[in-house]
């Protein structure tokens, strides 16, 4: 029988090396694994993912994968990083898919973090009426 994978004790260094790979598929696998580790009491994995968001900010395809992984890191820092994307990336037909992914990632965070961030975004007049309405509806759905 194969040993069971335990993300709390698995060495992180090889995954970090893979996470900075120039080969997109290799990096994506590592990001997903780092997200799993972050969810399972490995905050250093989540912090590394937040740093990768800074590195890959210009590549929305990679960023879409990264924000999904960050959504597994239940922290105020993750909520703030996801919220910041709505200010950093202008809403347009070309960025809509990415911003929708950011919204999905934000909703995946623990409800109190997600609700607080969505409410803040919904009340911010710097954002479009359409997005503010979506944030408000998403926060309302969290309340069930």
Roles of regions detected by a PLM:
Residues 13-24, 47-58, 80-94, 119-127:
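HEAT/HEAT-like alpha-solenoid repeats
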Residues 1-8, 20-42, 51-54, 61-76, ...:
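Structural detector for internal amphipathic alpha-helices that build alpha-solenoid repeat scaffolds
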């Amino acid at each position: 029988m194969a040993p069971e994978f335990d993300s709390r004790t698995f060495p992180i260094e090889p995954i970090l090396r893979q996470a900075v790979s120039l080969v997109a598929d290799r990096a994506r696998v590592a990001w997903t694994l780092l997200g799993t580790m972050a969810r399972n009491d490995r905050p250093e994995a989540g912090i590394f993912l937040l740093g990768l968001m800074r590195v890959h900010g210009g590549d929305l395809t990679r960023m879409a994968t990264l924000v999904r992984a960050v959504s597994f890191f239940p922290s105020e820092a993750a909520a703030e990083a996801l919220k910041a994307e709505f200010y950093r990336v202008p809403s347009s037909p070309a960025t809509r898919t990415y911003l929708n992914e950011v919204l999905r990632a934000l909703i995946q965070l623990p409800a109190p973090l997600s609700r607080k961030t969505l409410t803040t975004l919904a009340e911010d007049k710097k954002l479009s009426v359409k997005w503010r309405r979506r944030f408000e509806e998403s926060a309302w759905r969290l309340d069930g």
